[in-house]
Amino acid sequence: MGIEFKRSPRPTLGVEWEIALVDPETRDLAPRAAEILEIVAKNHPEVHLEREFLQNTVELVTGVCDTVPEAVAELSHDLDALKEAADSLGLRLWTSGSHPFSDFRENPVSEKGSYDEIIARTQYWGNQMLIWGIHVHVGISHEDRVWPIINALLTNYPHLLALSASSPAWDGLDTGYASNRTMLYQQLPTAGLPYQFQSWDEWCSYMADQDKSGVINHTGSMHFDIRPASKWGTIEVRVADSTSNLRELSAIVALTHCLVVHYDRMIDAGEELPSLQQWHVSENKWRAARYGLDAEIIISRDTDEAMVQDELRRLVAQLMPLANELGCARELELVLEILERGGGYERQRRVFKETGSWKAAVDLACDELNDLKALD
């Protein structure tokens, strides 16, 4: 089973951002995405929105962009159109990695054959997917580069997750995790960490096996945390919890863009890309999901360890010259701002401890969507 990879001549960028609707009185999720899509399509036909797995969610999707500021500006414009539609229905926009108390039984799945198939196959766990994320696409020039870069990106998995983690609560309980979304999503049979394939042919062989065994027939595709998007000629990084605001999204997209281009240029220079044993990658994923920005992570094949905050500061300094070249230096600097402000999970947990109510945490995320704006 050969898979054609639509090669991208330059490291273009695309971003998908999942946003939910909430009732301002109950703070619970509101399954009214179909109405929102209709209003936006009528009033702002230039805005690209997609319906999502849940009827309470819409996805903002950029076009093909060359820079982080371009992608963020497009998302900002689309967010304004989405807010206008939500206001007209008396709803608020909200997003984080997961909702702190909503009941999956009150949140219907969108009407789509592939969604029905996923629920039929995965049952309880499929119904639990009250989760939201950010997907970042970066263009790759040749399929032979895809898996070396993905395997290198897996060494940065905990950095991206800790920075974005915003799902500390579930079913009204503090889970003790920074990203409960991460723990939930990996319950689906085609989700979670990718295998560290060593070549494009090996990936094609794997996908042929999944097709022959009926796995792809059931799910439509593999939903790995980082995966090739052959149709677009990109690597799609799906690690991050959804951020409650464009400002933090900007930082995560900038870091992702810089990392992919950095590893691509290492290939150009004939340098060996970093990698970790699969068990180290898995452990790092768990540590970042559990401890967020307080995680101590494994940084070498010799099992050396460091604090993820220190590693993030090191990465920002290392990547800053490249960020200047790519036009996203200011956005990359926002990584340091997140470290100072505290992660989304920390802010939600803090307001819950102050008020004793997860409704206040929902309000916080709604307010941040309005107040923590992208850079001018």
From Swiss-Prot:
Originating organism: Corynebacterium glutamicum (strain ATCC 13032 / DSM 20300 / JCM 1318 / BCRC 11384 / CCUG 27702 / LMG 3730 / NBRC 12168 / NCIMB 10025 / NRRL B-2784 / 534)
Q: Which Pfam families match?
A: GCS2 (PF04107)
| Classification via InterPro entries | GCL_type2/YbdK_subfam (IPR050141), GCS2 (IPR006336), Gln_synth/guanido_kin_cat_dom (IPR014746), YbdK (IPR011793)
**The keyword ATP-binding is assigned to this record:** yes
Q: What EC number(s) has UniProt assigned to this enzyme?
A: 6.3.2.2
Q: Which family does it belong to?
A: Belongs to the glutamate--cysteine ligase type 2 family. YbdK subfamily.
Q: What is this protein called?
A: Putative glutamate--cysteine ligase 2
Instruction: Give UniProt keywords alphabetically.
Output: ATP-binding, Ligase, Nucleotide-binding
The keyword ATP-binding is assigned to this record? yes
GO terms, biological process: modified amino acid biosynthetic process
Root EC class: ligase
GO molecular function of the protein, one example? glutamate-cysteine ligase activity
Q: What does this protein do?
A: ATP-dependent carboxylate-amine ligase which exhibits weak glutamate--cysteine ligase activity.
Record's catalysed reaction(s): L-cysteine + L-glutamate + ATP = gamma-L-glutamyl-L-cysteine + ADP + phosphate + H(+)
